[in-house]
C-alpha cells in the first residue's frame, strides 16, 4: 500500500522474489504499510536486479536505498537460481560413494525420471525424448563394502579400507564435493557416518577443502533414489547457490543492512542461507505466492483458495483447503525425484514470455515450454529475441501499453510484434495478424483453464467452493480468460499482484523443519501397551529432530525459549500407498490415549482431503515419518483497510482509451490508472487497468470492483 511520501516511517522487512523474468521487492514499515518494486532480473549478477527493484519501490516512499536498508530488521529471498542450475546441469563436480554393486543406480534412476516433464507425444518421439545426464557421472562414483538391511541390521560390516580407497580416488579426481548414500542408512546410520568420518580424515590429509555430505545427516528418509538425489543437490547446486546468496547478502550489507538474508524454503517457512540443508530452497520462488495467499486468506476469512500465478515463464497452481496447504514429501523437480517437504504445486511452462511456434508437420500452434524470460519478446528491440512470445500477442491485441512496461523503464515496439507474428504465425496459417494473436491467447487461456479445472476437480472439489487468487506480473492480464465459466465463488486480483510472491516472503515465519522416516504399524485392535510403544517411538524421533531444529536457530542467535515447536507426523491406513502429513494435536506423545488422539487427527484430515466416507480405520494405521518444525515470528505486512467510496471511478483515474481486440472485433477500451482507483469503484469492460508493474484486463462481458483491502473482484456479467 503506498502512503504519502512525507509520512515518517521505519522500514522493517524486505521480501524478494527473483524470478526468471522480473525481480520483485516488497518493503514493509513499522505500521505494516508496504510498497512494491519491480525491475528486470539480472541472471549474471542477481544483486544488480535486486538493487534496481529496491530503488524502484522505495522511490514511491521518497526514500533512498541507503536510508531504507539501514533501518531494515530482516530480509527474505526467494528465487529460481538453484533450480535453473540443476535444470541446466551446471553444478559442482561431485563424487558419490554408495554400496559396492550399487554404483549404477544413480545414473539409472527411477524409471519415471526418464519421462518426467514430457508431453506424451514427446515421450514417444526419438528426436524429442532426451535422457538427462546424471548429476554425478559414473566415473566419479565409488562403491564400498557394507550392507545394512531394511530393518537396520548390519548384515555385512563396513570394510574401512574400501572407504579410504574411495575417498582417495575422488580426492585425486578433483571432486569439489563428496556425497555418501548407503542403503537403508535412515534406519541405521552407523556405517554411513563412519564412512563420512573416514572421508573427512582423507580430505584433511590432502590439504584440500572439499565439503562432505552424508545422507543420514541431511535426509534420513526412505527411498534410495530420492534420498541420494537430494543429498547430491546439497553439493551439486546448494553450495554454489550459497555463494550467490552470500554475495547478495554482502552487497546489501555494503549498502547498510545489518542482518543475514533468509531464504524461502520448499515447506513454506524461511531458513538462513547459512543453514545446513540448503537444497530445500531449490524452488523458493512460487512458494512465496502460496504463503501470501494463505496469510491473506487467514486475515480476510477465506478458507478454500485456488492460487494461480502467471509470470514470464510459467503458470503455477496450488490449492489451500480449510486454511491448510498440502505438503508433498517426494516431489519431482528438474526431472529428478527428491526427498523434500514441498508445498504441493503444479506448474505448466506457459507464461508471458513463452515462445510460440508452429509444428512444421501439423501446423499446430505450440506454446513453450521455453521462454524469453526477462527479455520479454520481439517487441523489445534490445532483447535479441527473434521468436514471437505471448507478450508479443499482448502488444498486437492492445493489452499492454508499450510506453509503460516497468513504468516506462523498458520501451516496447508494437510494430515489431506485428511484423514478427505476421511472418511466423499469421501468414503460414492464412490468418490476419490480429486473429493469429487472438487465437494464441485463446489457446493459452483454454489450456490454463482446463489445467486449473482438472486440478480442482481431480481432488474431488468444485470450483464453486473456492476463491481464486490471481497474481504474478502476467496473472491479471489473463485472469478473465482462465477463470471464465469455471464458477468460482469469487475471483480476486490483489492490487499488488505483481509483487505477491515477494509479499508472501515478507509474511513467512522464520521456520526450520526436519523429517525422519519411521515404520510404525498398528492393527485396529491393539492393546494399550503396544499403543504406548508406538507413541514412545514417535516421541523419540521428535526429540531427535528437536535437537536439529534448535541447533539451527542457535546458529542464528535464537535461544530455545524463543522458538515455538510444532511436531507432526505422516500417517496412512495400513496397506494404502499414500500417506498424509498431520500437524500433531499434542506437544508430546506417551500414553495410549495420546496415540488415539493422533489417529483421530489423521481420520479428521483424511475425511477433509478425500471424503468422510473414504475413511478406513478398520485397516489399522501406519506412521511413516516424524516431523518437527520450529518457528520464530517476524513482523508481517498489514493488509490495507480503506473506507469504500462511490461506484464511479474519479475522472483523475481515467488515462484515455486504447484499441482492444477480442472476439474478432476492435473496441475502444477505457484505460485506468490502478493506483488512482478508490475502494468501492466499479469498472465495466472493456477496460484496461494499468500499473507500472502489471496490467489488469477487463474485457467486455466482465466487471470488477475494488474493495477496501485494495483487492479487485472480477465477475462475469
Swiss-Prot record:
Gene Ontology CC: cytosol
Assembly notes: Heterohexamer of two alpha, two beta and two gamma subunits.
pH dependence: Optimum pH is 7.6.
Matching InterPro entries: ACX-like_C (IPR049517), ATPase_NBD (IPR043129), Hydant_A_N (IPR008040), Hydantoinase_A (IPR002821), Oxoprolinase-like (IPR045079)
Enzyme nomenclature, EC number: 6.4.1.6
Record bears the keyword Ubl conjugation: no
Pfam families: Hydant_A_C, Hydant_A_N, Hydantoinase_A
Protein function: Catalyzes the carboxylation of acetone to form acetoacetate. Has a reduced activity on butanone, and no activity on 2-pentatone, 3-pentatone, 2-hexanone, chloroacetone, pyruvate, phosphoenolpyruvate, acetaldehyde, propionaldehyde and propylene oxide.
Organism: Xanthobacter autotrophicus (strain ATCC BAA-1158 / Py2)
Keyword annotations from UniProtKB, A to Z: ATP-binding, Ligase, Nucleotide-binding
Name the UniProt record assigns to this protein: Acetone carboxylase beta subunit
Keyword Kinase tagged: no
Cofactor descriptive note: Zn(2+). The heterohexamer contains tightly bound iron, manganese and zinc ions.
PTM text: The N-terminus is blocked.
Family: Belongs to the oxoprolinase family.
Gene this chain is encoded by: acxA
Molecular function, one GO term: ATP binding
Listed cofactors: Fe cation; Mg(2+); Zn(2+)
Amino acid at each position: 500500500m503506498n502512503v504519502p511520501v512525507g509520512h515518517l516511517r521505519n522500514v522493517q522487512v524486505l521480501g524478494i522474489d527473483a524470478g526468471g523474468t522480473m525481480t520483485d521487492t516488497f518493503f514493509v514499515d513499522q505500521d505494516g504499510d508496504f510498497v512494491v518494486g519491480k525491475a528486470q532480473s539480472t541472471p549474471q549478477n542477481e544483486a544488480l536486479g535486486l538493487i534496481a527493484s529496491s530503488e524502484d519501490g522505495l522511490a514511491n516512499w521518497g526514500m533512498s536505498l541507503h536510508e531504507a536498508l539501514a533501518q531494515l530488521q530482516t530480509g527474505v529471498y526467494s528465487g529460481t537460481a538453484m533450480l535453473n542450475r540443476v535444470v541446466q546441469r551446471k553444478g559442482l563436480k561431485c563424487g558419490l560413494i554408495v554400496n559396492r554393486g550399487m554404483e549404477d543406480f544413480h545414473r539409472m534412476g527411477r524409471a519415471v525420471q526418464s519421462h518426467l516433464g514430457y508431453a506424451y507425444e514427446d515421450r514417444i518421439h526419438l528426436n524429442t525424448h532426451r535422457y538427462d545426464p546424471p548429476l554425478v557421472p559414473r566415473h566419479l562414483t565409488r562403491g564400498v563394502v557394507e550392507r545394512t538391511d531394511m530393518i537396520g541390521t548390519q548384515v555385512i560390516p563396513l570394510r574401512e579400507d574400501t572407504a579410504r580407497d574411495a575417498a582417495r580416488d575422488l580426492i585425486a579426481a578433483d571432486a569439489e564435493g563428496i556425497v555418501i548414500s548407503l542403503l537403508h542408512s535412515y534406519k541405521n546410520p552407523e556405517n554411513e557416518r563412519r564412512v563420512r568420518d573416514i572421508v573427512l580424515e582423507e580430505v584433511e590429509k590432502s590439504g584440500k577443502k572439499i565439503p562432505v555430505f552424508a545422507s543420514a545427516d541431511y535426509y534420513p528418509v526412505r527411498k534410495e533414489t530420492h534420498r541420494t538425489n537430494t543429498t547430491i543437490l546439497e553439493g551439486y547446486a546448494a553450495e554454489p547457490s550459497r555463494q550467490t546468496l552470500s554475495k547478495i547478502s554482502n552487497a546489501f550489507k555494503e549498502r547498510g543492512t545489518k542482518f543475514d538474508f533468509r531464504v524461502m524454503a520448499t515447506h513454506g517457512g524461511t531458513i538462513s542461507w547459512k543453514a545446513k540443508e540448503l537444497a530445500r530452497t531449490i524452488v523458493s520462488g512460487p512458494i512465496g505466492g502460496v504463503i501470501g495467499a494463505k496469510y491473506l486468506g487467514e486475515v480476510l476469512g477465506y478458507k478454500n483458495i485456488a492460487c494461480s500465478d502467471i509470470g514470464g515463464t510459467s503458470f503455477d497452481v496450488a490449492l489451500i483447503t480449510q486454511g491448510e496447504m498440502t505438503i508433498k514429501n517426494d516431489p519431482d523437480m528438474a526431472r529428478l525425484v527428491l526427498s523434500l517437504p514441498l508445498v504441493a504445486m503444479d506448474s505448466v511452462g506457459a507464461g508471458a514470455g513463452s515462445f510460440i511456434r508452429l509444428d512444421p508437420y501439423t501446423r499446430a500452434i505450440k506454446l513453450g515450454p521455453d521462454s524469453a524470460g526477462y527479455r520479454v519478446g520481439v517487441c523489445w528491440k534490445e532483447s535479441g529475441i527473434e521468436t514471437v512470445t505471448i507478450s508479443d500477442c499482448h502488444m498486437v491485441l492492445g493489452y499492454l501499453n508499450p510506453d509503460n512496461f516497468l513504468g516506462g523503464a523498458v520501451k516496447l515496439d508494437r510494430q515489431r510484434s506485428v511484423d514478427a507474428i505476421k511472418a511466423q504465425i499469421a501468414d503460414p496459417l492464412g490468418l490476419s495478424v490480429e486473429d493469429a494473436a487472438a487465437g494464441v491467447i485463446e489457446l493459452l487461456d483454454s489450456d490454463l483453464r482446463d489445467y486449473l479445472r482438472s486440478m480442482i476437480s481431480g481432488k474431488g472439489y468444485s470450483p464453486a467452493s473456492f476463491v481464486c487468487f490471481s497474481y504474478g506480473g502476467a496473472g491479471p492480464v489473463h485472469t478473465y480468460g482462465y477463470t471464465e465459466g469455471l464458477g468460482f465463488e469469487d475471483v480476486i486480483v490483489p492490487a499488488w499482484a505483481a509483487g505477491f510472491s515477494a509479499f508472501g516472503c515478507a509474511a513467512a515465519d522464520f521456520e526450520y523443519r526436519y523429517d525422519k522416516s519411521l515404520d510404525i504399524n498398528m492393527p485396529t485392535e491393539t492393546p494399550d501397551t503396544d499403543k504406548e510403544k508406538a507413541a514412545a517411538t514417535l516421541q523419540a524421533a521428535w526429540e531427535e529432530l528437536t535437537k536439529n531444529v534448535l541447533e539451527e536457530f542457535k546458529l542464528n542467535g535464537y535461544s530455545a525459549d524463543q522458538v515455538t515447536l510444532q511436531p507432526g507426523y505422516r500417517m496412512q491406513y495400513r496397506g494404502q500407498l499414500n500417506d498424509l502429513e498431520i500437524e500433531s494435536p499434542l506437544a508430546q506423545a506417551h500414553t495410549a490415549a495420546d496415540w488415539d488422539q493422533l489417529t483421530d487427527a489423521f481420520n479428521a484430515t483424511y475425511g477433509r482431503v478425500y471424503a468422510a466416507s473414504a475413511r478406513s480405520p478398520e485397516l489399522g494405521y501406519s506412521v511413516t515419518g516424524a516431523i518437527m518444525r520450529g518457528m520464530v515470528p517476524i513482523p508481517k505486512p498489514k493488509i490495507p483497510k480503506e473506507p469504500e467510496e462511490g461506484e464511479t471511478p474519479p475522472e483523475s483515474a481515467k488515462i484515455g482509451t486504447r484499441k482492444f481486440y477480442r472476439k474478432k472485433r476492435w473496441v475502444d477500451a477505457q484505460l485506468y490508472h490502478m493506483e488512482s482507483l478508490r475502494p468501492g469503484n466499479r469498472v465495466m469492460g472493456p477496460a484496461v487497468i494499468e500499473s507500472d508493474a502489471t496490467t489488469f484486463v477487463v474485457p467486455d462481458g466482465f466487471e470488477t470492483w475494488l474493495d477496501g483491502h485494495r483487492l479487485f473482484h472480477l465477475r462475469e456479467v
